[in-house]
């Protein structure tokens, strides 16, 4: 089990600390850094501890920033892997690897060491998160997707981007700009990953791990994804993602149309795309009428222009689910966080991640060829 953070947040050194940290500031940098979360020494804090002023940064969850790689590319990763197999002598070890080299190396080793499901989930959060909020979100995601035996996810790559920590509407537009910058970082990660695959598996002594990678985007995290897709050239896209889950997506309902040239690339990237929507989503209603020039939102109204993608794009209506896990005012009134608040939505997501035929996923009614409703 491993949880990594990919972030284009500013790197700072807090007063009195000896190690670098990601900043809470609403400021993005051109490059991203990789960190690994430390769960070996993690202890669940009491409610009293959570209320303290110093419950911030590493007091929420410890993490270690990977060093930057000395050389670009993944030839050194290949050299280390072949050395560990006794095929090639080398003085290099895993400690010589940095950044995505170290992360891809660790994931490959972990995922290829078991015959059981050991999936990776890339998660992109939405609006209104500072870095401390992101660390708390990581703890929630670990409980839901890694600790839960009903889920095939064993590893998480959390995409951290400097969303606003303010509820002031104007900050929404700052988040749009940040999401565009962060989408560029995500695009670079995708290209690095495809280069890793080419460099490593061009050698016949190394076999693919035959595990799955999923991509999950919530709310305005879909703007980050959209920015990445804008930048991806079709001829460079490899189908390296199994399931894509678009949760309460705060993007235009037209994003799958060819004129948008963004989400219509997802069928080239993934085996299946699932759009989870809630027609009573108050957050997306506010987004539509106050910040997006009355443009209906994908996660509330559903998509247009997906007829040609019906075989692999599904719409899952969560309007009638119960918030039985988290039922305070925020979740019951907002109808925006079903993946956190509803066991029915989580159950549906787990079946999706396992790759169960969409017509065989339980607790759904089939409304159309590719449109389903989760039972209340």
Q: Model-derived features: where do they sit?
A:
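Acidic, polar low-complexity linker/tail segments
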Residues: 85-117
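Gly/Ala-rich beta-loop-alpha elbow adjacent to hydrolase catalytic centers
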Residues: 186, 217, 221, 225
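Lipolytic serine-hydrolase domain surface
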Residues: 1-88, 127, 135, 149-211, ...
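Short, surface-exposed "cap/lid" segments of acyl-processing enzymes
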Residues: 106-162
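Hydrophobic packing residues within well-ordered alpha-helices of enzyme cores
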Residues: 141, 225-228
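Residue in the alpha/beta-hydrolase core beta-strand immediately N-terminal to the catalytic nucleophile
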Residues: 214, 218-219, 245
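Short, mixed-charge, low-aromatic patches
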Residues: 91-99, 137-146, 299-306
